[in-house]
Curated annotation (Swiss-Prot):
GO terms for biological process: isopentenyl diphosphate biosynthetic process, methylerythritol 4-phosphate pathway; terpenoid biosynthetic process. This is 4-diphosphocytidyl-2-C-methyl-D-erythritol kinase. Pfam families: GHMP_kinases_C, GHMP_kinases_N. Keywords: ATP-binding, Isoprene biosynthesis, Kinase, Nucleotide-binding, Transferase. The active site is at K11, D139. It comes from Methylorubrum extorquens (strain CM4 / NCIMB 13688). Belongs to the GHMP kinase family. IspE subfamily. Its EC number is 2.7.1.148. Transmembrane segments: none annotated. Pathway: Isoprenoid biosynthesis; isopentenyl diphosphate biosynthesis via DXP pathway; isopentenyl diphosphate from 1-deoxy-D-xylulose 5-phosphate: step 3/6. Catalyzes the phosphorylation of the position 2 hydroxy group of 4-diphosphocytidyl-2C-methyl-D-erythritol. It comes from the Bacteria. It catalyses: 4-CDP-2-C-methyl-D-erythritol + ATP = 4-CDP-2-C-methyl-D-erythritol 2-phosphate + ADP + H(+). One of its GO terms (molecular function) is ATP binding.
Length: 291
């Protein structure tokens, strides 16, 4: 069989409400409207007898030890759940920043599961594929089929595809990796404690851009304030986005440090991205669309 290829797009939390910390397992209960960008890593699978991984690309350096990479972890979980699973050599081209709040590693892991499922004739809703996604990480299940939807619980409750309008946007990462743990520590919730705040209204399917903005603008990312104490440069990135013509909303994604802004149109997004690259040449800046 020839080489199999798929994209692993950036996952953007348009909203991220932390509802509390669950008494049973200590995980943070969340509610998030997730969309995916058209900027992505690329993953290839060359069928073969051995499970291997090679990483290249501009952000390959910070991706961590190969053996601990989520691509291999996901593949091993699936192999443990499916007798005789056909394997092969993965080639990952990293374009997305690491530890950036956009689910790069989780999206890579989900991409690995998609390729292995294709190679082995498994549906993405096959119990072994779902189990492998959940075992690999909380954000992996929502990345299996990267289209806008709600996620709840600790990430394991995935809603139906919403078919939202594609939104012109700019992603900005100020070049500072931010681990999730210190951000949740700064949030400071004790086990069993709930966080006050309005829940997101029901998000309907097939909303146009104005309707999507009407839903997400009153919402929030509850990790933004604690992340600003961990990496204050996030605030600078948000301010720079908000200062651009045509910016309709700017917010942090995940636990940071990537921030995003929704713009009035693609031209405004591209102009803003160019201006930010000029102002901050060391930052990762990408005009994109979210859907």
């Amino acid at each position: 069989m020839s080489v199999l290829t798929t994209r692993a797009p950036a996952k953007i939390n348009l909203t991220l409400h932390i509802l509390g910390r669950r008494p049973g397992d200590g995980y943070h209960a969340l509610e998030s409207l997730v969309a995916f960008a058209d900027v992505a890593d690329t993953l290839e699978l060359v069928p073969g007898p051995d499970l291997t991984l090679d990483i290249s690309g501009p952000t390959a350096g910070p991706a961590g030890p190969l053996d601990d990479n989520l691509v291999l972890r996901a593949a091993r979980h699936l192999a443990a759940g499916v007798d005789g699973l056909r394997l092969g050599a993965f080639r990952l081209h990293k374009q997305l920043p690491v530890a950036a709040g956009i689910g790069g590693g989780s999206s890579d892991a989900a991409a690995a599961l998609r390729l292995l499922a294709e190679l082995n004739g498994l549906a993405l809703d096959h119990p072994a594929v779902i189990a492998a996604a959940r075992a690999t990480g909380a954000d992996v299940p929502v990345c299996l089929d990267p289209r806008a939807r709600m996620m709840r619980g600790a990430g394991e409750e995935i809603g139906p595809v919403l078919g939202l309008a594609s939104l012109p946007a700019v992603l900005v990462n100020p070049g500072v990796p931010v681990s999730t743990a210190p951000v949740f520590k700064a949030l400071g919730l004790a086990v069993g404690q709930r966080l006050d705040g309005a829940e997101l209204p029901v998000v309907g399917a097939s909303l146009n851009a104005d309707a999507v903005l009407a839903v997400i603008t009153p919402a929030r990312n509850d990790l933004e304030a604690p992340a600003l104490t961990v990496a204050p440069v996030i605030g600078e990135a948000l301010a720079l986005l908000r200062a651009q013509a045509g910016c309709r909303l700017a917010r942090m994604s995940g636990s940071g440090a990537t921030v995003f802004a929704i713009f009035s149109d693609d031209g405004a997004a591209e102009t803003a991205a160019a201006a930010i690259r000029t102002a901050e040449p060391g930052w990762w800046v990408e005009p994109t669309r979210l859907a």
